[in-house]
Amino acid sequence: MKYVSRSACEMRGALGGVIKEVELLSSLEHPFLVNLWFSFQDEEDLFMVCDLLTGGDLRYHLQNRVEFSEQSVALLVCELGSALEYLQAHRVVHRDIKPDNILLDDTGHAHLTDFNIATRLQKNSLACSMSGTKPYMAPEVFLCALDEVAGYSYPVDWWSLGVVAYEMRGNIRPFVVHSNTPLAEIKNILNTPVHYPRYWSSNFVDLLQKLLSTYPGARISTRQELHQTPMLRNIDFQMVLEKKIKPIYKPPEDHLNCDPCLELEEMIVESRPLHKKKKRLAKQRSAQRDSDPETALVKEFIVYNRYKELKRKAMEQKEHDWQRELELAMANSIVNSLTPIQEKPVASTVHDDDCVTAPSAAAQLKGGIIEFIDRTPSPQIKESASSTLNIPTRPFHK
């Protein structure tokens, strides 16, 4: 669960970014993203409940000097490449791909998180703000900041993925760039050739070179282009999506895959620790009993429930399937002709003078219009053996 202080966000002017992140995550779902399940708020904080991933972030494992093989790096590139292609289909640029924002599950599969500075592009538009972490930012982002290009697009995330892949294999980054490095100097650094150790395979180097191309048009930016590289030519991406390819590196299960100091800091240093929130809010609400609690909430922060969303989507799919079945049934049912109604003559023993018969259909058709056809059966009257009507009479008296 991720939670942020409303007051701290308002002081830093970051409240809009949190609201935007929740709106963005509520529209996304992918096997290699950290998916949002719930979002809610109280008087103090904004909460986001996401997938539980116990493997820790990639930065933690790099700091612990985990040696990732080329095969391990290649699988991570495939998994995150699938996530990037999904984001591109939804017009989303992440803009902050780095080891800190890549979480591992208990089996070692990678998941992308932290969409705080992500943006959704309009059709045929470019992003132009300088957003991200400098050591992982693509050359065109810096060129845009120097007003040398109009903007940048989805390939910036693939550059960042290439930097992460290089760092996983060599435990150093391909370029020496820091947060305080001037833009002009960064431009020169990124134009220098990248050094690849001799013991790295040619196929692995080829993959990194295509991810770290300084020209966005020549850079790998799709899953198909990944599949065309010699390193990943034999990878079954459908099995990758279904997580059927087992990662070589599995995070340890005997301890927390994170720095325990960070967990203790929240309990000791934090002025408003989460574990004391219930008691604290009870006092506040008691003191503000006469005020409207709704006025203390951020109206723009959406309340999201993925369970309800999945139920709604399932119902929509059922309705769509029913509609399609109905349309197919109607399209396949062809009426060749209509059989006219045949009237059967009704035998009657009543004299013609005693009843009025309805005109036949044929007679009505001669007139051009059938106004009404009476199909009520004629009354059946039983006759006596002598075929005479036995009507009782009474004597007539003058």
Label each residue range with its predicted role.
Residues 44-57, 61:
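Conserved short submotifs of the Hanks-type protein kinase catalytic core
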Residues 76-77:
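Activation segment signature within eukaryotic-like protein kinase domains
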Residues 213-220, 224-245:
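Terminal C-lobe "cap" of eukaryotic-type protein kinase domains
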Residues 3-28:
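Conserved N-lobe beta3->alphaC-helix segment of eukaryotic protein kinase catalytic domains
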